[in-house]
Amino acid sequence: GLAYDIIKSLGINNEKLSEDILRPIEKQMPEVLTIMKLAKEEARRIGRNVVGTEMFLLGIIAEGTSVAFEVLNDLEITMKDARLVVENLVGYGNEYFDKEIIFTSRAKRVLEKAWLSAKNSNKSKIEAVDLLLAIIDEPNSLAMKALDQLGVDAVEIKHGIQGIR
């Protein structure tokens, strides 16, 4: 658009602009917002208009830089395996074309627990690790069912978080 034309006319290298300005802004973006965006993308990928805890799990893995990701990675949970398990749990749909993507009531509860966890730790924003702790606090969630099928339980995750922190 117009901004691109102005940048081009000023002779500013588009890659340099991205490197110097956009990436640092993205790094300041709270990781949980990135995870939410990735969770929505995962829901769309399998034709769903609902984001549940299982999509949060995929979002954490897809984000790939957080402490929560490191814990899951150390437990040898890969995106490929996690996607396969989640796809088997929820199946494919064609819903997302019709509606805006919404969060399940359990996903909202997990976000609320994550916010309380962050607040109780005197943090100004929710981190992925708060989200992961909130997920494992919901033993009947689809995310925990997926983790169970991947051979990981809440105790291992808590232990992993304590080991990294």
Stretches found by the model and what they are:
Residues G1-R165:
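Histone-fold recognition with a strong bias for associated Lys/Arg-rich disordered tails
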